[in-house]
Amino acid sequence: MIRQETEFGAITVDSNVYRNIAGLAASNCFGVKGMAARSRTDGLIYLLRKESANKGVAVTFHDDDTITIDLHIMVDHGVNIPVVSSSIINEVSYNVTKSTGTTVKAINVHVDSIMLEER
């Protein structure tokens, strides 16, 4: 949680806020099928619904009031993964900084699966 003191009091931003912003921003990028989560019981990777996108996001807080974001995603078959990942990093960093004022130290994109087209 990030806490900022002002002359009128304190502002705290919970990790769920960062997770929601990052998950939604990543989900809206071209080539991203959705956020991914690995089941702890069977080890399988599941595609998360848009309203659960924050479950594929982990946020780490640093002492210098910056954050690191880890995103677990599924991509569409045939996309250029480095280009999609770069787009995600730019989009998530922009949206998190714009919405919260917090500096993003790093964004790590983990491509957990590729969704094949159904025929």
What is the predicted function of each stretch?
Residues 1-77, 86, 102-119:
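Contiguous, often N-terminal, cationic amphipathic patches that form binding interfaces
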Residues 81-100, 104:
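Short, non-transmembrane amphipathic alpha-helical segments
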